[in-house]
Amino acid sequence: MREPRFWYPAQRNSVPLAARLLAPLGYVYGLAGRIRRGRAEPQRAAVPVICVGNLTAGGAGKTPVALTLAEGLIAKGEKVHFLTRGYGGREQGPIRVDPLRHAAADVGDEPLLLAAAAPTWVAANRSEGAAAAVRGGAGLIIMDDGFQNPGLAKDFSILVVDAASGVGNGRLVPAGPLRERVDDALSRANALILTGRGHAGDGIAARARARGIPVFNSIVRPAVAPDFGAGPFLAFAGIGRPEKFYRTLRELGAELAETISFPDHHMFSESEALKLLVRARELGARLITTEKDAARLSHAPVSSARWRLDEAALRLPVRALIGDFPSLMAQIDDAVSRARRR
């Protein structure tokens, strides 16, 4: 889905009419979530669980953060496994993701990215997924998303917030982008990471610091050095905030002839793939997209337009560059040590 414009009004203190009209539904949504979390009895996994989650619906950059944390922990000798819901996939799990066998329609796009870095499990029931990961050899679990899911106890919870958009109009879904009230989320957070550049996240950062929650800043950087010498490019993306991807490309020196955006987790049709191929030829441009979008094009039938688009498009793998990363890792190490002493 595309985020409604009234979720992020140009005037930060204004409340658009649509948000006011939908506020009662937001109240019901928030109340249902609080009741669900209040009644839940979280199951504790046999290994430490680190959660990387969002406060808002849409893309805040949590997956690059999860990948960066995994790389740091693997370098320390941890047997890291990812656990995720697999948004957009048909599998309920628990199931271990196999990139050679599974497509995005099976397990979702993000699990395919995670599986390239560490063993990854998709499970609608997180506690069952954690148990499956432990049986599969996990020594530590990173849960990508699931901050609002009360089924599995977390040993260290990280909230990821986009610095450029913050908490938007501050309303709950569907009146705004919030999955829960800010104070409720902060009461369970051990760290806050602001991704990207901007000041819209300053307010929640101040509230986090007032509670003694450490705040870290992060920017997205390519995992490998890109070669943009043979531009221009037609960039396309179906992610939460595609403009962030386009901005990153420009900052890296790419000449963008055109950009084409799709809804988050969009499954490309044959006609859409063909239109992208034709438009790139008309512009004399090379195609470039995100790793997530490329994951959704994988396993397309050979010679189909989607297969040709997958073959033609350059993809930009990214990781989060987290400021004061050693401090964050030290706090995670402490939480992991405490969990193992239980």
UniProtKB/Swiss-Prot annotation:
Pathway: Glycolipid biosynthesis; lipid IV(A) biosynthesis; lipid IV(A) from (3R)-3-hydroxytetradecanoyl-[acyl-carrier-protein] and UDP-N-acetyl-alpha-D-glucosamine: step 6/6
Record EC number: 2.7.1.130
GO terms for MF: ATP binding; tetraacyldisaccharide 4'-kinase activity
Reactions catalysed: a lipid A disaccharide + ATP = a lipid IVA + ADP + H(+)
One Pfam assignment: LpxK
SUPFAM superfamilies, sorted: P-loop containing nucleoside triphosphate hydrolases
Binding site for ATP: 56-63
Keywords per UniProt: ATP-binding, Kinase, Lipid A biosynthesis, Lipid biosynthesis, Lipid metabolism, Nucleotide-binding, Transferase
Organism domain of life: Bacteria
Its biological purpose: Transfers the gamma-phosphate of ATP to the 4'-position of a tetraacyldisaccharide 1-phosphate intermediate (termed DS-1-P) to form tetraacyldisaccharide 1,4'-bis-phosphate (lipid IVA).
Family the UniProt entry places it in: Belongs to the LpxK family.
Name of this chain's protein: Tetraacyldisaccharide 4'-kinase
Organism, scientific name: Parvibaculum lavamentivorans (strain DS-1 / DSM 13023 / NCIMB 13966)
